[in-house]
């Protein structure tokens, strides 16, 4: 009787030890997955950029020009995966980016205007140095015809690459290169577009 009681107590102790081991192990795994998945947590980004670039009007004379811009940016970065993290080289954020643009165009007569860009961007977020690529299009309204003799409304498709550095967890500085095209998409018979190589520098905050 005494021996059977000892065997029963030993079995209960083994089951309890196994239960404790499992209960301490599972939360650690869950924490690791949650921590990795947090690399792509949903955020709202607010930022500002300054840009300048040399361009060329694709008229007969190939007239040189330049474009300067002040940009205010809002980007929504949703979370697209849960649970098991992605491979390291794939970890990043997809963002829908909306930009308000104030632009100045060097021509005769000089022109300025307001515009709106809608872009899609992918940013790799594996460390504090974060490369990105982006592309989209916008529309720009100006106070003078751009180029001269054309229209005051133009479309602005653009693609680019960038690199940002996280100064703090929610604060980043960075730069971009964009190939920027401006034209009226056939609203006039001639429609000479402007191709510009833009360099941008700015700062952003994640919320």
Model-predicted regions and their roles:
Residues 42-56, 96-102, 133-139, 175-179:
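Transmembrane beta-barrel strands of outer-membrane/channel proteins
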Residues 72-74, 116-120, 133, 159-161, ...:
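Membrane-embedded beta-strands of outer-membrane beta-barrel proteins
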Residues 26-42, 79-94, 125-130, 167-171:
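Short loop/turn motifs that connect adjacent beta-strands in outer-membrane beta-barrel proteins
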Residues 51-71:
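Surface-exposed strand-loop-strand hairpins of Gram-negative outer-membrane beta-barrel proteins
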Residues 1-38:
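Cleavable N-terminal export/targeting peptides
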Residues 55-59, 105-110, 142-146, 184-188:
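Outer-membrane beta-barrel proteins
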